[in-house]
Amino acid sequence: MTNIESKHGIVSRQPYELYMSFTDLSNLAKMLPEDKKEMVTADMDTLSATVQGFNIGVKVHQRVPYSRIELVDYGAPFAFHVVLHFEPAAENPYHTDFWIMVEADLNLMMKMMLSGKVKEALDKVVDGLVDASNGKMPEGFDVSKWAGQ
């Protein structure tokens, strides 16, 4: 198994607030730019997307309230497990130490091709959440479509 861990980011929201934003996977689809939404289908427990001609999906495996959400592959060409962590930040319990861990069953070639790109994408997600929690929204992001508002 290949293990990939994102950087940790301190999000300026309490763990329960951030956790609740991720409990319904359809919220993630709502945040996408309009030109990407047609490639994604989602409901409370599943999210599927077509990326560069490949279909890949996740479904919720376990929710641990205000602490962790575990996702597993769902119609993907390889097995993987994703864990979103929402822990109180050590220096401020009203902020969240957020990070993502991925465990994937990749052969050596796929590991060499994908590991760096997956790590980079995970770090961008963490950075985006940190920035958004501090009022810096990504270009093209429509706050009115976010269910957490």
Q: Which stretches of residues belong to each language-model region?
A:
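Beta-strand/loop substructures that line and gate deep hydrophobic ligand-binding cavities in soluble
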Residues: G75-D127, D131, G140
